[in-house]
Amino acid sequence: MPVRQLPEQVVNRIAAGEVVERPASVVKELVENAIDAGASRIDVFTDGGGRRRIGITDDGSGMTAKDLALAVERHATSKLDDEDLLQIRTLGFRGEALPSIGSVARLSITTRHAGEPHAWALTVEGGEKSEIMPAALAHGTRVEVNDLFYATPARLKFLKTDRTEAEAIREVVRRLAMARPDVAFTLAGEERAPVTWAAALPGAAGRLTRLGDILGAEFRSHAIEVHAEREGIVVSGYAAAPALTKANALGQYLFVNGRPVRDKLILGAVRAAYSDYLPRDRHPVLALFVTLDPREVDANVHPAKTEVRFRNAGLVRALIVHGLKEALAREGRRTAANSGESALSSFRPAFTPRPASWDWRASPSAPVAPMPSFDGAAAPAFTERAQAAFDVGAPSADVRFETQPVSDLVDRPLGAARTQIHETYIVSQTRDGLIIVDQHAAHERIVYEGLKASLAANGVQRQILLIPEIVEMDEATVERLLERSDELASFGLAIESFGPGAVAVRETPSLLGKTNAGGLLRDLSEHMAEWDEALPLERRLMHVAATMACHGSVRAGRRLRPEEMNALLREMEETPNSGQCNHGRPTYVELKLSDVEKLFGRR
């Protein structure tokens, strides 16, 4: 068959296959056009999941009759000149959207430029263009798309249900609304009540308002501002505290120069930043905005413009990781406050008041043991003086501690320890409320941060076992551990082969105190079996540290003396990220006295 030039309609339908994947693709292209036209208000209406009808109305600059005629021609655009492809500043730039849509649907455009006496209208059906006619429209542009894919019915078979397609449209509009909080959006149709997002004030406060309107009040209450800047690249936005997570990455909204993207490099940076805060099966919720010189990023690498390529990808990744880690460390205490508010909402009265006629005479009951009395002993350096008291598995040692009056300790951020309940939770008193601490989770974070700091400094201090501990395991597990023995040694865990199916543990990290070496090695081996061979060394080391921290922490069920509890509180105050354990759960919750008084009707 000889080579021949394809008809224009066929060319447009081929292009439509890349640009117009589903109704949501149409909405994305048309809303981006409205934003590029300088609109301050955009209204979106859909019916039948966008199959039957899509309507977009904006108050942007509009088009003249001449521009309208060119707008439905392929690769005709006002957003690009000969030299601009390497510095794209608009959301659209190829000039493909309108002709592609018109080739597979019934397209109607009505537009009015500010300098025109009236509006102009044009229709395109299956690639066939009508004459441009005068029309009525106050200002801006109205685009209607009816019977999507009627000209290519085979494409209809690949669409989902109306409800699924409508949800995809909703997600597209949500992302574009996040990118432009200065623009008002309305989304209507699909037998739903219209959703309106009013234009927000400029600046960070306006952005948070828009994000809260879209992502909900829970995100707003957990939101932490992110800002980092280096060499002309700015990373800004809001990330939720680790207490708010999802089972997938759908809650991560990423933008580059105002363009919604799904970029693997940025997603990888987000995972790295949260690696110390979340378990591997949980994902953070955030909206990050990367702003940089358009010449430093290529937006023309994907048909749907959802991917970008950075000239200096390493710097962008490092800046995102730095900005997120700094924000999370700075706002670590807010997790506790938010968790306390959530806990308060579930409180209910534990009894029903008796009628006045009931007999209120006391009934026999078992005597209640008196609460322990103490003056609030505190250890100024938990990891040094108090370590003996926290040796895992050891009884409470006779350790001497310096003491401070309770009245002094209540002014500390985590207050003065008052009691321990269920041998698991420490209750402390602050000047304006109380704090409940999960002793294992808190100590786990302290040990983890201590291991990291030691590794970054002069190495982890180790303790030599007088009698090496022999741990028997299957040969595959032993081999896996011995292959990583150098990495384990960097954390003070020295092992060597002890014949088939066994290893000898000769040294353990001092921070762990007395630990179950066998259990630690088995857990380490299980985690190593899940590692990807391409996992960077730093990430592998952090996984080792996290596992060691879990084993080296005071356990739930361990009774603590007052001085031990205060020692833990003081060390938490000095430890970075102490508001969450290594798995992302809060280490403590804070209840204000005013909130407690509300529970008892005092306020």
From Swiss-Prot:
InterPro entries: DNA_mismatch_repair_CS, DNA_mismatch_repair_MutL, DNA_mismatch_S5_2-like, HATPase_C_sf, MutL/Mlh/PMS, MutL/Mlh/Pms-like, MutL_C, MutL_C_dimsub. Keywords: DNA damage, DNA repair. It comes from the Bacteria. One of its GO terms (molecular function) is ATP-dependent DNA damage sensor activity. One of its GO terms (biological process) is mismatch repair. GO terms for cellular component: mismatch repair complex. PROSITE patterns: DNA_MISMATCH_REPAIR_1 (PS00058). Disulfide bonds: none annotated. The keyword DNA damage applies. The keyword rRNA processing does not apply. Belongs to the DNA mismatch repair MutL/HexB family. This protein is involved in the repair of mismatches in DNA. It is required for dam-dependent methyl-directed DNA mismatch repair. May act as a 'molecular matchmaker', a protein that promotes the formation of a stable complex between two or more DNA-binding proteins in an ATP-dependent manner without itself being part of a final effector complex. PANTHER family: DNA MISMATCH REPAIR PROTEIN MLH, PMS, MUTL (PTHR10073), DNA MISMATCH REPAIR PROTEIN MLH1 (PTHR10073:SF12). This is DNA mismatch repair protein MutL. The lineage of its organism: Bacteria, Pseudomonadati, Pseudomonadota, Alphaproteobacteria, Hyphomicrobiales. The gene is mutL.
